Amino acid sequence: MSERIVISPTSRQEGHAELVMEVDDEGIVTKGRYFSITPVRGLEKIVTGKAPETAPVIVQRICGVCPIPHTLASVEAIDDSLDIEVPKAGRLLRELTLAAHHVNSHAIHHFLIAPDFVPENLMADAINSVSEIRKNAQYVVDMVAGEGIHPSDVRIGGMADNITELARKRLYARLKQLKPKVDEHVELMIGLIEDKGLPKGLGVHNQPTLASHQIYGDRTKFDLDRFTEVMPESWYDDPEIAKRACSTIPLYDGRNVEVGPRARMVEFQGFKERGVVAQHVARALEMKTALARAIEILDELDTSAPVRADFDERGTGKLGVGAIEGPRGLDVHMAQVENGKIQFYSALVPTTWNIPTMGPATEGFHHEYGPHVIRAYDPCLSCATHVMVVDDEDRSVIRDEMVRL
């Protein structure tokens, strides 16, 4: 006889979500559904009608875990709408900011999954390693972008200022010194994850991967014409779940996809492994890739070069697209600027892409492994909330106009 297992909210993630699993007599998941129950904030609606420079400041507050990708995706979208060509040094500083954020965010995830993989006798060493890596990565973001949480120096047209030559040398030396610690930490985490003994094939699915760049992002690799979005009542076969779900379902070429570290490794480094262990391994390896890129940028950066372009902020109504590879995957912001005001704004964020893939990925294994599958995606639900309940009496969701966050 089928039984329903409900985990609400799922734990060790940002925001609130629910995992509903139908299981057979042996406890094996036959149907998995994962959905956001985090309420909408409506930040995209808040920026509509305002001056372009307000958008990055507001939408970076979509989430306290991933403000860097949202800031960068916002300025990239507005740059595109206003046809701004950002100077090379400005582009490098933006990428440096994101590369350091990748290292920091992936280290945070290792803290969240530590109870799953790290034995008690190694817990203190692992957490101290996470803390040291985070401290140094956040220092880079602070120095380059102004603040580690809400970066004030990332601007439309580029960056507020270049860093000094002294700062470049200090950051370069600091990251070179950090490299052995990151290498050691990655080796430790991969070893512990692979030795855990999770079932072979756990979390494997047949959905395609989607990524635009190994570290930063490339709007030319995201085709808006191949993207569609459906409401939850058209996706979930359970009407009650469809009513409660707070995110839309994005599709690429008509299919739900996986975004994130494994997707980037698949698309740009020929990574072949699939499933939960592969996702954790890819995320750990990406820490090394991101750190190496940050060091390369500091070696390449001309601190005397301009970092911001002049531009006319009036705009013509062109739809601009910003595609940024956040730690959790592809973060796409879209903006239209006309007559000096934002006429339209929408964000399509990583966890929104992953939600329809995560639930079915739990199927075929005992339900006790369900949370392992979910945590492998490092979900961020505040970012993923897209649907507003408009009738408290019957819990119906808005149909004709979606609120996208």
UniProtKB/Swiss-Prot annotation:
The keyword Ion transport is assigned to this record: no
Keyword Metal-binding recorded: yes
Keywords of this entry: FAD, Flavoprotein, Metal-binding, Nickel, Oxidoreductase
Catalyzed chemical reaction(s): oxidized coenzyme F420-(gamma-L-Glu)(n) + H2 + H(+) = reduced coenzyme F420-(gamma-L-Glu)(n)
Co-factor(s): Ni(2+); iron-sulfur cluster; FAD
PROSITE patterns cross-referenced by the UniProt entry: NI_HGENASE_L_1 (PS00507), NI_HGENASE_L_2 (PS00508)
Pfam families attached to this UniProt entry: NiFeSe_Hases
Gene Ontology molecular function: any one: iron-sulfur cluster binding
EC number: 1.12.98.1
Cofactor note: There are 12-13 Fe atoms/(alpha(1)beta(1)gamma(1)) unit of the FRH.
Enzyme class: oxidoreductase
Superkingdom of this protein's organism: Archaea
Binding-site positions, Ni(2+): 63, 66, 380, 383
Subunit field text: Heterocomplex of the form (alpha(1)beta(1)gamma(1))(8).
Described function: Reduces the physiological low-potential two-electron acceptor coenzyme F420, and the artificial one-electron acceptor methylviologen.
Family: Belongs to the [NiFe]/[NiFeSe] hydrogenase large subunit family.
Protein name listed in UniProt: Coenzyme F420 hydrogenase subunit alpha
Species the sequence originates in: Methanothermobacter thermautotrophicus (strain ATCC 29096 / DSM 1053 / JCM 10044 / NBRC 100330 / Delta H)
Gene for this chain: frhA
